[in-house]
């Protein structure tokens, strides 16, 4: 009914504009990495709009990107606070593995590293993916060489569209961008009635 369309017009447009903006921005990032001759994939983060995570993550996939974890339940990501509270990378990964064994969970474990010592500890303990946090492109290249295919690699931390190519060329498997969902600009859309001159209002 016309009334229903008018009642939901703004809600529909708000969602379509935001999700289309996310998909468009993701496509722009991923296509630029492809055009640069790299195999690096674009990842989103959990920095999503409250209540709209699933829609926003679906928009990222539509745009050609990949989803990082959906929540705390489908992957273990050991960040700086986890590492510091545990007393180091070795302890953090070890305790995460023990948690999975104890609770019968088959979860991938990713560990953030901030320096070479933490990288060496992560490689020694073993995990599924290592995130290089705030590494320079040059250090990222060295880190990827040190990992030597033993696990997946990811770059993160203040990387933008203008600075991402050198990181991808350094050989990382993934680059994560919080901006895809927390700083995106919605597309300009409008809702117009077609053939309204033929309608009869009763």
Describe each region flagged by the PLM:
Residues 1-112, 117-125, 129, 138-146, ...:
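Acidic/glycine-rich phosphate/pyrophosphate-binding loops and surrounding catalytic core
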Residues 179-202:
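Short, charged, intrinsically disordered terminal tails
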Residues 161:
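Cys/His-rich Zn2+-binding cysteine-cluster or related metal-binding knuckle/ribbon modules and their
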Residues 134, 157, 179-180:
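Short secondary-structure boundary segments
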């Amino acid at each position: 009914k016309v009334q229903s369309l008018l009642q939901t017009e703004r809600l529909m447009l708000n969602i379509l504009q935001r999700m289309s903006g996310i998909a468009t921005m993701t496509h722009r990032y991923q296509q630029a990495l492809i055009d640069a001759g790299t195999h690096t994939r674009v990842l989103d983060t959990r920095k999503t709009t409250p209540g709209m995570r699933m829609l926003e993550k679906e928009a990222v996939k539509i745009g050609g990107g990949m989803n990082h974890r959906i929540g705390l339940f489908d992957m273990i990501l050991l960040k700086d606070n986890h590492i510091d509270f545990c007393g180091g990378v070795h302890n953090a990964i070890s305790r995460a593995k023990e948690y999975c064994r104890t609770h019968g969970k088959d979860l991938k474990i990713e560990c953030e590293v901030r320096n070479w010592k933490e990288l060496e500890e992560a490689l020694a303990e073993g995990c599924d993916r290592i995130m290089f946090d705030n590494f320079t492109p040059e250090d990222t290249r060295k880190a990827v060489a040190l990992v030597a295919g033993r696990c997946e690699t990811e770059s993160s931390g203040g990387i933008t569209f203008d600075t991402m190519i050198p990181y991808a060329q350094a050989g990382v498997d993934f680059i994560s961008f919080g901006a895809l969902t927390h700083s995106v600009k919605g597309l300009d859309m409008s809702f117009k009635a077609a053939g309204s001159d033929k309608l009869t209002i009763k």
